Amino acid sequence: MVLLESEQFLTELTRLFQKCRTSGSVYITLKKYDGRTKPIPKKGTVEGFEPADNKCLLRATDGKKKISTVVSSKEVNKFQMAYSNLLRANMDGLKKRDKKNKTKKTKAAAAAAAAAPAAAATAPTTAATTAATAAQ
């Protein structure tokens, strides 16, 4: 994984989006980063380790190429503005969900479910009434 500066990360992320525009996906993760490069031991605590600054670790991959950057709390506003503009520019291929078909299907299913018990309840009553009238 390549650790880049913020500006380089954004340019490489733009390249990843362009490469995956026709087919493929770009996966982006964001998590809090405390500066550790080694895993935390299971038992006990690490003595004398205090993170000096809150940081965010951003990673992006297309499945083959991986890039990452660390953004400090001082730079987060500037980075977030550039990052949001980049996402707006490159996520134009997203499609809105078709809500009309979903609501029609659920209404039809609900109507059928409501009609089935009502029909079953009225059918014996109608048959009993018909049998009673035929017997007289």
UniProtKB/Swiss-Prot annotation:
Name of the protein in its database record: Signal recognition particle 14 kDa protein
A Pfam family: SRP14
Molecular-function GO term, any one: endoplasmic reticulum signal peptide binding
InterPro entries hit by this protein: Signal_recog_particle_SRP14, Signal_recog_particle_SRP9/14
Subunit annotation: Heterodimer with SRP9; binds RNA as heterodimer. Component of a signal recognition particle (SRP) complex that consists of a 7SL RNA molecule of 300 nucleotides and six protein subunits: SRP72, SRP68, SRP54, SRP19, SRP14 and SRP9.
Chain positions with Phosphotyrosine modification: Y27
GO BP of this protein: cotranslational protein targeting to membrane; protein targeting to ER; SRP-dependent cotranslational protein targeting to membrane
